[in-house]
Amino acid sequence: MLDVNNFDRMRIGLASPDLIRQWSSGEVKKPETINYRTLKPERDGLFCERIFGPTRDWECHCGKYKRVRYKGIVCDRCGVEVTRSKVRRERLGHIELAAPVSHIWYFKGIPSRMGLLLDMSPRSLEKVLYFVAYIVIEQGDTPLMKKQLLTETEYREHREKYGNRFRAGMGAEAIKELLVEMDLEQLCRELRQELKEVTGQRKVRAIRRLEVVEAFKNSGNRPEWMIMDVIPVIPPELRPMVQLDGGRFATSDLNDLYRRVINRNNRLKRLLDLGAPDIIVRNEKRMLQEAVDALIDNGRRGRPVTGPGNRPLKSLSDMLKGKQGRFRQNLLGKRVDYSGRSVIVVGPELKLHQCGLPKEMALELFKPFVMKKLVEDGHAHNIKSAKRMVERVKNEVWDVLEDVIAEHPVLLNRAPTLHRLGIQAFEPVLVEGRALQIHPLVCTAYNADFDGDQMAVHVPLSAEAQAEARNLMLSAHNILNPKDGRPVATPTQDMVIGSYYLTIEREGAKGENMIFASPDEAIAAYDAKSVHLQARIRVRPTARLQEALEFAKSEARSFDEQGRLMTTVGRLIFNSVIPPKVGYVNEVVGKKQLGNIVARCYDKLGISETAAMLDGIKKLGYTFSTRAGITVGITDVEVPEEKRRLIAEADSFVEKVEQQYRRGLITEEERYQKVIDIWNKTTDGVTQALMRTLDKFNPVYMMANSGARGNIQQIRQLAGMRGLMADPSGRIIDLPIKANFREGLTVLEYFISTHGARKGLADTALRTADSGYLTRRLVDVSQDVIVREIDCGTHEGIPVEAIVDGKQVIEKLSDRLTGRYALEEIVDPETGEKLAAYNEEIQADAAERIDQLIKQGKLAHNAVYIRSVLTCRTRYGVCRRCYGRNLATGRSVEIGEAVGIIAAQSIGEPGTQLTMRTFHTGGVAGDDITQGLPRVEELFEARKPKGLAIIAEQDGIVRIVDNKGRKDIEIVTDDGESHHYAIPYNSRLKVEDGQRVQAGTELTEGSVNPHDMLRVKGIQGVQTYLLREVQRVYRLQGVDINDKHIEVMVRQMMRKVKVEEPGDTDLLPGGLIDIADFEAENLKAIEAGLEPATARPILLGITKASLATDSFLSAASFQETTRVLTEAAIKGKVDPLLGLKENVIIGKLIPAGTGMSRYRNIQVLVGDEIDEARLEDGMA
């Protein structure tokens, strides 16, 4: 077997007949499989032991040699080599064909490679291969043309007329002859010449032919190898035959397909020996060709061969294709040992880095470790007795188990694993019962709840795996979310309501304005029930409190005249778990504030302090939410008094609008729009009235206001009015639901509201699948983006400013700058302080300040130039400076970080939260702009969007002209040229007469076609557009994603250029090539004094970009497996194994993190060796 770690590239190509014979261990001559009586393989059959090796370890077929001592002997009676039976997984056989057959991939694939080489249409080729027509091989001195097709009758006529002066044939033999005599060099020269002379369709055809010819010429594959004389037979263990209980046999479909090939082949041999008539032989040859086609790719041509029950048989191609194929099922999705799964329950007393592991489960998972320890400690004499002890569960076993699991982390995973936080490491704590216990703070990351969710446990075995789990995957180290750098382990639900109740201030409570000498005294008074938890009190600051106040926000420092702190007992208790350096919290704490506290703590004090603080907040939160005893009853839902008046007003307004409509003063469309506006305003009015009337201590209000559960919209439906609903098509019904759930809905109102509810459920189901598929494509396109060096040395970057949509700020400038490297020095004009230095990271406070200065217009320009992944020059992957900060750690990104995968997960994971719907908000018909998930997909796939906007292609002044009742636009450029744009009837203009526009400005509403944007505004224009649009969709749904993740994707979409003129290089016109390769080719040409090639950048959708990758393994395991492999084989492609996927497929360590060669090729030197090495270095 080959050693996986010993090679660094992998090549694929066409196998010549001689090579196949060389691989083979013997020829399969009979279609038999196994003998039905003895159940032993038949000799020379598909399972023959002589060819493929023995079925039992160290035992020959006839039984003359048994035992390992005869290893390597070939039995003289049965010819079987005595060896391990697992050779039956690797030994190939072969079938010698009586007549050559074509390989269906190369004849039937699109484009047909054989057809392009021979310059024949696939239809004519099919006629020849399947014995319908003759093809002229040598025309001699006859008027026939070479490669001309002749029907049976034409062939006979010409035979009678010219005798043997010409040669024609049919079937794969004829094609093979034509392929053998091809001169690729000559053909290549002719085609390159032809390219210079022809245009249009003929040029396209010539380019495609040249591609195939060049591929054969450069790869060393011969064209005639596309026709097979020998067929390899895959090892029998890969197409097994097993006996079922009833004595019947289940067999792999491949055996059936091979059997048909062998039967037909043997029959053909017999017919040829007998000298049968031509027509019978031809028919048999055609059947052989069809049998081989079915074996290689069943169903590609004609009707698929079916097995029992009309099920199409699975051919070799089907074994590789799709989710159940070899690539995705076995190579990328392996099963693991040492794992278990169980239901999860909450473990509120666990620490952040712990999980509760059921005892019986732990014993089974750590069995080998326990057995080893039992022997070491002398409880058992040998492994066998230790095993018996464990199986009988003796008392000593539990003590040993405790020792074994100490310091041994386990991994917990919840499906679906949408991002890397879906697998985290914990230290196990043994618990009774059979359920896993989960710390409540990691639920957000797992998206877990306790309504019956299950989780899987995995045990990292090797020391390296344990170190990795502990240092990188421990839950306490994953407090920040990689997608936006915000804390993901923030308290939720009960903990939030507890903290909220603890820190809220109640006026007129018992003990108000009492004065205490220290926080401890205040807390003692609360314990003695002399002061209420939420009463406002005054406290003299102690040393710890003083320190906390120094770090606190200015609002928190409210003192009375004597310098005593004004606060509440609850806040003192809350601050007892907050480290002083985070600052004293003197405000009402809801979910948002908790998030900020965690972020601040992580920033200032690091991981261990934050984890301890989180556990403190968790404990307090649970304690006080229990003490508060917050409950919800129907009386807590109070309907505001003003509701009746507001609704009556709205009804009268609507009546007026209806009257205007009936008199014909307004159109149906205007009526609809007005009614909807009236009801939207009324709904808002009722909601505001509701919020005014609700008491600050109303449990429903407290829940929503603190962020523990629910929101204003839901309270509105409970106690305000439900408002407008949409019908099944998404159009808003202009009859609102005036009632709320407290009052109860009428039958009609209930019916109207069911549309929305049902659509919501259907949407969710569809969305999950779509989002998953989008994530898969994103991962595939970016999986080889790894941080490979510190600095790529580029001086380019991108300008960034706040992303604005109309009046609404979608993404603040400070969010876009934090943690990125600046390309220019920025100095504060007021203080002269340096806010950003060239090639250094911009910190959060500096980013905020730059944002302020730009808003006040105090900096020279509005955009800040930063280093970006989009302009990074690293060949495979990105560099540290262009990427900037790793959001999951808050520090600069490490070399070896797989930032592509992180980006894909960060964009894909929130995908399920995006809505599906296309909004039809009244307005103009046909103006439905796609939004939500479909819009993200449309952008990443670079599709032409629905509802196209027309964009200006020049800079100039807009003139709006009337053209037969519709508005058209003319743009007058600075040199006086006028350009006309026809505007469709139902489009709305976005520009005004006399406005100055730049190229790329949208003239009408809608979405821009990104390919037009690339043409008009160039690479940077389209990159900014895609980034802005994707951000818009996510931010409008309230999902924050950092720019850099989207940049990684956009960069992968823009990796290729299309060659226009090849100049004197070897590039093919119209070919796609990586920018870096293109530049290298041109550099070579210029150095040699030749003419360089020209090319234009193109934008590929993520699916296309994944398939256009350098790695054929990655592309084949993604989609269109057969097409990718066909092309790769003809080109003799070499896979450089740089991405993660390829290495997982072949079983190598992935080249990320410590798997990178720079971390692995390290020599450890000791003592004197170091001095010697230094001397050598000095001499070198």
Curated annotation (Swiss-Prot):
Residues that coordinate or bind Mg(2+): D449, D451, D453
One record GO biological process: DNA-templated transcription
Job of this protein: DNA-dependent RNA polymerase catalyzes the transcription of DNA into RNA using the four ribonucleoside triphosphates as substrates.
Cofactors that this protein relies on: Mg(2+); Zn(2+)
Cofactor comment text: Binds 1 Mg(2+) ion per subunit.
UniProt organism field: Heliobacterium modesticaldum (strain ATCC 51547 / Ice1)
Lineage per the UniProt record: Bacteria, Bacillati, Bacillota, Clostridia, Eubacteriales
Gene3D superfamilies listed in its UniProt record: 1.10.132.30, 1.10.150.390, 1.10.1790.20, 1.10.40.90, 2.40.40.20, 2.40.50.100, RNA polymerase II, clamp domain, RNA polymerase Rpb1, domain 3
Pfam families registered for this protein in UniProt: RNA_pol_Rpb1_1, RNA_pol_Rpb1_2, RNA_pol_Rpb1_3, RNA_pol_Rpb1_4, RNA_pol_Rpb1_5
Enzyme class: transferase
Keywords (A to Z) from UniProt: DNA-directed RNA polymerase, Magnesium, Metal-binding, Nucleotidyltransferase, Transcription, Transferase, Zinc
Family the UniProt entry places it in: Belongs to the RNA polymerase beta' chain family.
Annotated catalysed reactions: RNA(n) + a ribonucleoside 5'-triphosphate = RNA(n+1) + diphosphate
Full protein name: DNA-directed RNA polymerase subunit beta'
